[in-house]
From Swiss-Prot:
Coiled coil: none annotated. Catalyzes the conversion of 4-hydroxy-tetrahydrodipicolinate (HTPA) to tetrahydrodipicolinate. (S)-2,3,4,5-tetrahydrodipicolinate binds at H161, G170, T171. This is 4-hydroxy-tetrahydrodipicolinate reductase. It comes from Leptospira interrogans serogroup Icterohaemorrhagiae serovar Lai (strain 56601).
Length: 270
């Protein structure tokens, strides 16, 4: 009996940290394979073997800047490039009717609107964090907020490596959104850090605290404080592959799906 063909995945932003992790994960996947690895036209890695660049054996998939060709030949696209590239990715995916996983964090509201529009024509998975564990963190935070939110002081802690440019992280922003929606609060209830002489803490306040130091892959904690006890819900990423595994899982989920904007809750059935 012949083996089923593997899902062909085009990876955009393939030379970065996440790109290298996804190349590595795809090298051992039984369901999917890397069909193209796309980098910018100015990349010093153009023409290099993406497997060797990712610290694994040669895979024969060299870095290219031909986005359209990569999308055209793929079953699904994973994009971990930059904000500036998002419009080009969406345009190509719509043109060739290919689903896409968007792993770019810190999107503007206009870019999120663009995802909504594009999702009327193609399947899209967008999540600020592709980790299976982090999405469980999201769900547990929602549950805790329903049970303890109105009797607790709530704080979010976001720790990442010193190279990360956006703050708070997309994951911290998602945690904030979950809390606000669950508790019926607004952005006016959110405080980013604290300094100086302040008034006493408002009972509906949600604090967000950002650390950028060392080489931390990503730690997030949501705290629920009451006078009698404290709940801490923490996720710590120990290997960047956790995000890569989730991204590949999301791509496999999308193949054959009808157009729409999906999140990791849909992918994981949460």
């Amino acid at each position: 009996m012949s083996q089923p063909s593997k899902t062909q995945i085009a990876l955009i932003g393939a030379s970065g940290r996440m790109g290298r992790a996804i190349v590595s994960v795809l090298s051992t996947s039984v369901k999917s394979t890397l069909s193209s690895s796309v980098v910018s036209q100015s990349s010093v890695f153009l023409g290099m073997d993406s497997g060797l660049h990712s610290g694994i054996k040669q895979n024969g998939v060299n870095f290219s800047s031909d986005l359209e060709a990569a999308v055209r030949s793929a079953d699904c696209v994973i994009d971990f490039s930059t904000h500036q590239n998002l419009d080009f990715t969406l345009k190509a995916c719509i043109q060739y009717q290919k689903p896409v996983v968007i792993g770019i964090t810190g999107l503007t509201e206009l870019q999120k609107d663009a995802l909504q529009v594009a999702s009327k024509e193609i399947g899209i998975v967008y999540s600020p964090n592709m980790s299976i564990g982090v999405n469980l963190l999201f769900k547990l935070t929602e549950i805790a907020a329903k049970v303890m939110g109105e009797i607790s002081d709530i704080e979010i802690q976001d720790i990442h490596h010193r190279h990360k440019k956006d703050a708070p992280s997309g994951t911290a922003e998602k945690l904030k959104s979950i809390l606000l929606e669950t508790l019926g609060r607004t952005s006016k209830n959110v405080v980013h850090g604290r300094h100086g002489i302040l008034k006493e803490r408002d009972s509906k306040e949600i604090g967000i605290h950002t650390f950028r130091a060392g080489e931390v892959i990503g730690d997030h904690t949501v705290y629920f404080f009451t006078p009698e006890e404290r709940i801490e819900i923490t996720h710590k990423a120990q290997d960047r592959k956790t995000f890569a595994v989730g991204s590949v899982h999301a791509a496999e989920f999308l193949v054959g799906r009808k157009p729409g904007l999906y999140d990791m809750f849909a992918v994981l059935g949460l």
